[in-house]
Amino acid sequence: MVALKSFRHSGPSFADLVPYAGLVDNGVILLKDGSLMAGWYFSGPDSESSTDAERNDVSRQINAILSRLGSGWMIQVEAVRVPTADYPKESDCHFPDLVTRAIDAERRAHFQKERGHFESRHALILTWRPPEPRRSGLTRYIYSDTASRSATYADKALESFSTSIREVEQYLANVVSIRRMMTRETSERGCFRVARYDELFQFIRFCVTGQNHPVRLPEIPMYLDWLVTAELQHGLTPLIENRFLGVVAIDGLPAESWPGILNALDLMPLTYRWSSRFVFLDAEEARANLERTRKKWQQKVRPFFDQLFQTQSRSLDQDAMMMVAETEDAIAEASSQLRAYGYYTPVIVLFEEDQARLQEKCEAVRRLIQAEGFGARIETLNATDAFLSSLPGVSYANIREPLINTRNLADLIPLNSVWSGSAVAPCPFYPPASPPLMQVASGSTPFRLNLHVDDVGHTLIFGPTGSGKSTLLSLIAAQFRRYSGAQIFAFDKGGSMLSLTLGIDGDHYQIGGDATEGGDGKALSFCPLADLTTDGDRAFAAEWIEMLVALQGVTITPDYRNAISRQVGLMAESRGRSLSDFVSGVQMREIKDALHHYTVDGPMGQLLDAEEDGLALGSFQCFEIEELMNMGERNLVPVLTYLFRRIEKRLTGAPSLIILDEAWLMLGHPVFRDKIREWLKVLRKANCAVVLATQSISDAERSGIIDVLKESCPTKICLPNGAAREPGTREFYERIGFNERQIEIVATAIPKRDYYVVSPEGRRLFDMALGPVALSFVGASGKEDLKRIRALHSEHGAAWPLQWLQQRGIAHADTLFPAD
């Protein structure tokens, strides 16, 4: 016979070390000891932009929630740092030109570098062990209804657990953004079969192996310990699935804590899982434990022989006296039930295929923990127990003896969330799953910048001169081209968008200057009365003529208004549509004289009195208005009013962006102020976002529509401003909702590198992460650069970007712009 005993007998396996038994309800797992477990994903507030009072308030609320729990409960807060390389795919972007495509390709390569960027995800696990049946048997006699008496122990335990976690979830939802880990079902084989996947079980599998993937549950979801198992090799440096496992334990707590004391751990540029386990004790159990500690220290206050012979040597241990006082304070807190006590076990788990690299990472984590004032050690003999203690639902392994209270726990657990932005464009008018506007950097954590909050994309950008405002606007315009059918209308000052506009073969108009030419080389002139097709067109034309007359100091009377409307109606049926045709046809001398300034015989005739309109609006239009702004109100207002009208007619639902650089020039004029107010209220329906950029904070405040700007522009981007803390400027930031900490961030940020974005979704200080290709087109705004760009454009035409990049020393320029 074959000796089969050695094959039939097996020792304990890894499945015997984990407690998971079965799935008993949606998102609820039963453990082998009868405990029930549920989990949530959550995102806490951004403490980097919060004041000390706000951080303390969050910690106070978390303590109030956790102090309700007692013996039998355990909470585990997990912070997972994972690599991210989810830059929008090239196939999801629709850049119509080589320049913006090259800029985005450069940014994609930057953000997809190996081990380049990481982001944090947070989870919370609650475990409850019901009291034994013999201890809860009396409760069935308290209730008189038949259902309560006939319900089984398991049903009552599950109902009690569901009620408790629902209350905890409701309380936590007031502090953090939270989502329950649920069981989901999908149809297979033509809806003949239903497959079940549980998010909590998937997270457990991730904690065990470090690999995140869905796990299909069996028809009867029991014996889950065998599904979650992995190959474990025990040792000083254990191996799981052929990957080395490192565990760093936090074992020395400082004398005091404050909210977010370990937030630096949540920003490290490496992959790890930080587990914080807390096993709750009832007030009675906590007092009993604390009383034993008090007696131990009390015995050390007086020397042994003084206690033995009842003498008074007056040699007292002052340290022991302090410990007794602190322990008595802790007993009082436990008795008040304002704070709960329990056993706290924090560990950081790392996986790595190379043992030497794992050791380096563990030492880096240990150094960071020690720098924060904590003790830390890299586990060796205790590594397996420490790893087991980090797994969801494991309450028996690696119990750390000293008690801490829930107020300290609220300071220690990872609640801070670095806002990473939406992974898709939040605007519902864009195609589903459209990529975000652009990805920028902030340390080792990337940030997806979107101007939109739901369907509102209006944005306010403000900061002092020379802090990088024009570069940001140009990059926003370049990255906005990723959306199919996108159209951009920019009002520029100083030629900061000239290089980008010419590079993408857009239309650049220098209105009112000596070189009044369009992008096609033809002289730019307007024929505002060219389109009189609809009643709306004729109404605008009549109103526009009335405005010209009023700007010349003539009071509009009903007779004048009727004469203007009558002449506009006649012109709608004739071929001549120029302003001179209108003047020759209108019968009132006062109107003729008032409009003389705008005809070919006057100084503005070159712009406003053309037979045909020279403005052909394309998908990217840039209007240089610096010269126009210096021509006075009588000349400025008619031109911009007409341009605004032409742009409004182009807004048919395609993704659109209107950029107003140096918007303080427009905020100071009643006509444009009212137009901006109107745009902010109605253009969102046309899928158009308005970006207002200004360097004059005082002008924005005096504009009279600062409240409209604050309410209608949910996204605000602040440029570094060293004067933000000074009186006068501080009040403006406070008026738009900034707190003391946010003002401090703006004041200490680095000009031309840092930008601070604030929206209802979150707050973040970011860096645009510009490469040399992007800088060549969005950052070239100096006079010498613009002069050289104009010369190259004149000499090489559409091929000038290649010459420009080669002159700037970019070696791979020929690969970005291949010859036809």
UniProtKB/Swiss-Prot annotation:
Keywords: ATP-binding, Conjugation, Nucleotide-binding, Plasmid, Signal
CDD domains recorded: TrwB_TraG_TraD_VirD4
Keyword Signal: yes
GO molecular function: ATP binding; ATP hydrolysis activity
UniProt signal peptide: 1-15
Keyword Signal set for record: yes
Amino-acid positions noted as binding ATP in the UniProt annotation, renumbered to this chain: G463, P464, T465, G466, S467, G468, K469, S470
A Pfam family that the UniProt record links to this protein: CagE_TrbE_VirB
Database matches in NCBIfam families: PRK13830.1, VirB4_CagE
Family per record: Belongs to the TrbE/VirB4 family.
Protein name from the UniProt record: Conjugal transfer protein TrbE
Lineage: Bacteria, Pseudomonadati, Pseudomonadota, Alphaproteobacteria, Hyphomicrobiales
